[in-house]
């Protein structure tokens, strides 16, 4: 049985919502075990609450060592100046021991993201994230254009061939759209199908 981990960081809940729909897509594939976890918050709780961070998220916090237990990992992060959030970077910077052992070599790595604006760095966030995964020897999987949501021209929407994305709005008031959530589900299903093939 293939094991898929959806691992995310979410400040205000947008990436959390996307992660839940990626899990939904992955769980639609028979014979795949799907786990949802998040990386630790690095901002002190009182300070995080004061700036509106959603600190009470249901997903348990992951540990670095458990990454080796999965056949595929789908990472989710908000964008920080065109890169992954510092919380995700801090977590991944602790994976040197896994790198030394080659523990993630040959496993699938995939990424989804959230940005504040339509051109806020969603693609650079995902492609720069890929660098870390490639150093670990992971096999990168995105979202193919077989996913019809990628060519939706009827609305302002996230979604890239590199991975699912959502646009949160500059003030965070916009929630993931139906199209963005469809792309997220597609990504989860696509990764799970490939993980199942590789694990068999």
Swiss-Prot record:
InterPro entries: Flavodoxin/NO_synth, Flavoprotein-like_sf, Flavoprotein_WrbA-like, FMN_Rdtase-like_dom, NQO. PROSITE patterns: FLAVODOXIN_LIKE (PS50902). Keywords: Flavoprotein, FMN, NAD, NADP, Nucleotide-binding, Oxidoreductase. It is an enzyme of class 1 (oxidoreductase). Residues 4-191 form the Flavodoxin-like domain. It comes from the Bacteria. FMN binds at residues 10-15, 79-81, 114-120, 135. Its cofactor is FMN. Transmembrane segments: none annotated. Substrate binds at residue 99. One of its GO terms (cellular component) is membrane. GO terms for molecular function: flavin adenine dinucleotide binding; FMN binding; NAD binding; NADH:ubiquinone reductase (non-electrogenic) activity; NADP binding; NADPH dehydrogenase (quinone) activity. Binds 1 FMN per monomer. PANTHER family: FLAVODOXIN-RELATED PROTEIN WRBA-RELATED, FLAVOPROTEIN-LIKE PROTEIN YCP4-RELATED. Belongs to the WrbA family. This is NAD(P)H dehydrogenase (quinone). It comes from Burkholderia orbicola (strain MC0-3).
């Amino acid at each position: 049985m293939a094991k898929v981990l959806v691992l995310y960081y979410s400040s205000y809940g947008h990436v959390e919502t996307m992660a839940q729909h990626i899990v939904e897509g992955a769980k639609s594939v028979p014979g795949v075990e799907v786990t949802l976890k998040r990386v630790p918050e690095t901002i002190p709780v009182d300070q995080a609450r004061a700036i509106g961070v959603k600190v009470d998220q249901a997903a348990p916090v992951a540990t670095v060592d458990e990454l080796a237990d999965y056949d595929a990992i789908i990472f989710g992060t908000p964008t920080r100046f065109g890169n992954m959030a510092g919380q995700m970077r801090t977590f991944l910077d602790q994976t040197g021991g896994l790198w030394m052992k080659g523990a993630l070599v040959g496993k699938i790595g995939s990424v989804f993201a959230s940005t504040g604006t339509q051109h806020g760095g969603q693609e650079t966030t995902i492609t720069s994230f890929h660098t870390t995964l490639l150093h670990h020897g992971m096999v990168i999987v995105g979202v193919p254009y077989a996913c019809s949501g990628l060519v939706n021209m009827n609305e302002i929407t996230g979604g890239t061939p590199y991975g699912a994305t959502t646009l949160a709005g500059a003030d965070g008031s916009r929630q993931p759209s139906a199209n963005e959530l469809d792309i997220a589900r597609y990504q989860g299903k696509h990764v799970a199908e490939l993980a199942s093939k590789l694990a068999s």
